[in-house]
Amino acid sequence: MIESKNQSFFPNRFDCVVVGAGHAGSEAAYIASKGGAKTLLITMNLDTIGQMSCNPAIGGIAKGHMVREVDALGGIMGKVIDNTGIQFKMLNTSKGPSVWAPRAQAEKKEYQLKVKHTLEAEKNLSMRQDTVEELLIENDQVIGVKTGRGFEIYTNHVILTTGTFLSSLVHIGTYQNENGRMCEPTVKGLSKSLAKYNLKLGRLKTGTPPRIHKNSVDLSVLAIQDGDANPSPFSFSTEKITRRQIPCYITYTNVETHKLIHENLSLSPMYSGQIQSTGPRYCPSIEDKVVRFADRERHQVFLEPEGYETTEIYLNGVSTSLPEEVQWKLVRSLKGLENAEIVRPGYAIEYDYVDPTELKPTLETKKIKGLYHAGQINGTTGYEEAAAQGLVAAYSVLHSLKNLDPLLFKRSESYIGVLIDDLVYKGVEDPYRMFTSRAEHRLLLRQDNADQRLMKYGYELGLVDQESYDRMKDKYERVNSVREKIYQIPLKPSDEFQNLLDQKGITNYKFGMKLDSFLKRPEIKIEDVEFMLPEVSSWSESEKNILEMEIKYEGYIKRELETIQWKNKYLDLAIPEDINYESIAGLKKEAIQKLKTHKPMTLEKAGQISGVDPSDVDLLLYHIKGKRKQEAEAS
């Protein structure tokens, strides 16, 4: 039992208290304080605010979309990575624009310090180095927290962003230690406090790979992976990335690596029974990869530098909790790493989380008013997912403090909406990671138009300034104006046009056809027709891409918007009690099983079942509508 202390020497009443200062906590503390709430951020170590505990990178498939959404809403992650990145890439550019995604390697320590300095500059934000061991609750309402050193701090809004620190346990072979990260203490009291108020807790597991010394690697024999020559920023406020970029490198596991892993599987905590918790399905350990994909002769390994000055390299793709001596052999079995020195071992970590179905879409707990959860405490994995949740929780606190109706992010308007919807209605069975495939309306949720979709919400709360908001509106007014012009411009003979036709090898065209039809050809880019649109020549690459995509995918976008309206109309559609799910062509086996078990009464309820995807709901809708039409015609 922690003895309470009377603390008159520093303020002990706040509008909002944020517990934990990882990516969820940093975003939550920034948004709450920026929005005018007197906020306290409590973390066990002020030197690890914004720390990249695992990979030194931000963004990626779907994750990059969320970073841009967080930025559009006034968050800090996009700005920080633009200022601290060491390699920038736009992923998936060979595919459709809906899945293009920015990713950047970070200068790891610089990123962390930039987050800390950004928070320190907020006038409404105080910071304390301590832990929180107990929630103070009266009549199912949070009234404050009690810290590890016995101080009581009072507030009606608490955001828990505890990461992997709740009753956590680190594993390296048979070695175990109660750490939240390697060599950092766990927090036990808070788990007990949550359980005391009947919040459903579970256990999850994650892991991290070893870090190696750059000077012990023969980089000359490895494949080089460079960044983009013209990198795209994450933040809508960043005009251009001018930082020096450095390469990553690629190697592969091999037969020797796999043999070594198989021979030592009994020493892996995951396979010895030492770890019982569920790990991330989409970020498996190297042990899992070798066992689950036994037919694969090799697995790709990325060597990612952790900064300009440090010699540490992150081995992306080799997450492991094997004993350290085995890790050394494993690493040295890789091409180019025959003499590699491990400076930090890989490890697995088990930790408590709270079932996210305990939450409202605002991320407030259903059982305790004023208590919000964000990040890995909700069963997610990833910096970007955490940042998005921290922002949502802080938005909810601000709306509560200002007596505004809560802001509920829709699946049809943001990846953040998809994330929150999946968590609170479907829950998690393993650490949740965002993918573009989770968003049924991803063509509308492109990374380039996050400002158009969401910036208005940040502006309304004072989190986005007038200049940024006006700049966004001006941008889309320009795009819309030129788009309307494109519909009217006929193709006419000219030397420039003939040169373009010859260059592209185009013969099947007609003079008089409108420019929009010509632009819809896959080989034609907006830059190719700038001689017809001189005003576009001064635009940014992003603005040109937006214009081009809206022309090329006009039909698909229009159909998607119509589908959203149509589906919203039928969310309350009743599912017949005698429905035969097995008879619905295309319905997945898992969906059939879950639907038969839960027996949802409406389409909306069906979509809230874990294992039932949006595509399954679409099939249900078409089936029910088809059946009704047949019955109507028969009668």
UniProtKB/Swiss-Prot annotation:
The keyword S-adenosyl-L-methionine does not apply. GO terms for molecular function: flavin adenine dinucleotide binding. Its cofactor is FAD. FAD binds at G20, A21, G22, H23, A24, G25. The keyword Flavoprotein applies. NAD(+) binds at residues 279-293. SUPFAM superfamilies: FAD/NAD(P)-binding domain. Keywords: Cytoplasm, FAD, Flavoprotein, NAD, tRNA processing. Coiled coil: none annotated. GO terms for cellular component: cytosol. GO terms for biological process: tRNA methylation; tRNA wobble uridine modification. Belongs to the MnmG family. PANTHER family: GLUCOSE INHIBITED DIVISION PROTEIN A, PROTEIN MTO1 HOMOLOG, MITOCHONDRIAL. HAMAP family: MnmG_GidA. NCBIfam families: mnmG_gidA (TIGR00136). NAD-binding protein involved in the addition of a carboxymethylaminomethyl (cmnm) group at the wobble position (U34) of certain tRNAs, forming tRNA-cmnm(5)s(2)U34. This is tRNA uridine 5-carboxymethylaminomethyl modification enzyme MnmG. It comes from Leptospira borgpetersenii serovar Hardjo-bovis (strain JB197). The lineage of its organism: Bacteria, Pseudomonadati, Spirochaetota, Spirochaetia, Leptospirales.
